[in-house]
Amino acid sequence: LVKSSAASDVYKRQPFNNVENIKEDILRSQKRFMEELGFVPDLFAFPFGEASENVISIIKDLNIKSAFGQHSGPISHKSNIHYMPRFSINENFGDIERFTFSSSLKPLIVNNIKPSDMFISNSKLLNFSFEVQNKKLINGLQCFGNLTGEWTSIDLIKNKSSVLFSEQTTYKEGRRRINCTSKFNGEWYWFGHQILIK
C-alpha cells in the first residue's frame, strides 16, 4: 500500500497558499513517484491535514481515488472520499488498547458544518456549529479541542438537532483540532474536525 503526499513543505510555509502552487507541488510529487516506482499512487494524504474545497478539486482532477486528512474518526457512508478521517497508530498512539478502542468506534455523522471551509482568517468572527444526524446522540455529546493550544473540553449549546460552540470559546492561531464523542446504548460515536486559524 503506497500513498502520495506533497513534494515539499509548501503547506507548512504557506498554509493559505494559492491552489496553483499547491497543484504544482503535488505534480512534482507524482513525477517523483513515477521516476522511482513506475506508477503514481491513487491514495493521497494531505500534508498537515489541510484541504480547502479548491485543493480537493485538484485531487479529483488528478484522478486520485481517495485522500485522508489528519482529523480523527471512523469513516461513514457520508464521509468525503477525498477528505476522509483516520486514526494515528504510531509509537505514541499505537498500543493495543487504543487500537481496540479506535476500531470499535461508530461514526458520529454530522451535517451543515459551519464554517464549511477549514481555513479561518478571522477567529473573532468564528462561530463553529454543526447538525447531528442521529438526534439520540446529542444528549451525551461532548467535544474537546486544542483551540488555544492545550486540549480542553468545549462548552456547547445544544438544541434538538444542532450543536453550537459557546460564545465564550476562544481560539488561537494555528492548526486546531476538534473531537466530539457520544456514548449511546453502550457504543461510542466519534466525529473529528480540523481548522486552520490564520
Language-model-detected regions and their locations in the chain:
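Extended hydrophobic/Leu-rich segments
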Residues: 10-16, 26, 72-73, 93-96, ...
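Single conserved hydrophobic/aromatic residue that forms the stacking wall/gate
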Residues: 1-7, 11
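Short Gly/charged-rich anion-binding patches and loops
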Residues: 6, 28, 54
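Alpha-helical scaffold elements lining the catalytic groove of polysaccharide deacetylases
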Residues: 9-37
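His/Asp/Glu-enriched short active-site or ligand-binding loop at hydrolase and phosphoryl-transfer sites
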Residues: 12, 32-42, 50-95, 105
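Terminal accessory/targeting
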Residues: 89-198
